[in-house]
Amino acid sequence: MSASPTIKPTPAHNAAPTEPPIGMAGTTLAAWMSHSRWLSVGGALMLLAMLPTFALSLLHRQQFNGIDAYDKPLKFQLSLGIYLLCLAWMRGYLTPAGRARRVALLTDVVPTVAAFGEMAYILWRASRGEASHFNIATPLASALYGLMGVGALLLVAASGVLAWLLRRHASPGLNAAFLTSLRHGLWLTMILGGVAGIYLSGQTGHAVGAALGGVTNDAFGLPLSGWSRTGSDLRVPHFLGIHAMQFLPLFGWAASRWWPEPRAILSVHGAAVAYALLTVLAFVQAAAGVPLLFGL
């Protein structure tokens, strides 16, 4: 009786684990919910809230500083919604053990609660035609503004905590260049966005340069953003800092597709330095009272 032939393992048997798709930590709603129910639901609700806010802007005509008072709530709802959903997406690159750590609450529950607290205050002030930021007219207004500032710090701190968690608990097999871009973007959001926000909150307004002939009325701002064209605007560097967590991962995703890993990683480092310098330059320009487009 002849012996049974020995079955040799095929390459498929010894194949390395499939690398997770670069830039995709699960694209279904169920996947995002598994990463963070708080962030996913919170981000979606924040974006959906733009619909009733827009309706309010049509039904309740309220002006503030030359523009519709509901422009600011709409912009913040868009920005905060994207921020929360980005955190939910990036948490998908953590191992289950990383997401289960107690400190991970700072990237989940805490920023969601802080975002809705800040949004409620901004919307309430808008409905009254009053300033939400820089409003220290009364002791109550000063206290509420300070509380909103604490919430804003908790929001940007969440990005730094997530960057630290991705350093220690990133999913195995993740492309190194893309992972580097995630961490760089999150750190820059916390540092640049946080520093610009702290400086901005200590001023009497976002516009600089009125004494140099600039116009601080927001009615003369750029389309969509509302940034001043005649005076400088401290919101520009704050915007760049806060959104580093979207720009750099997008660059890292592209770099990991175009170049070999060592070159892609080096390009991500270079992009992070360039982005930081651009943000610092925008801050120096704004603080000096020079318009973003030099008055064009």
Task: State where each predicted segment sits.
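Hydrophobic cores of alpha-helical transmembrane segments in multi-pass integral membrane proteins
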Residues: 38-58, 70-93, 108-126, 147-164, ...
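Membrane-interfacial catalytic/cofactor-binding modules of polytopic membrane enzymes
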Residues: 201-244
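Short, Lys/Arg-rich, polar N-terminal cytosolic tail immediately upstream
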Residues: 1-35
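Non-cytosolic membrane-interface motifs at loop->transmembrane helix junctions
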Residues: 64-73, 134-147, 175-180, 294-296
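Membrane-helix interface/capping segments
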Residues: 90-103
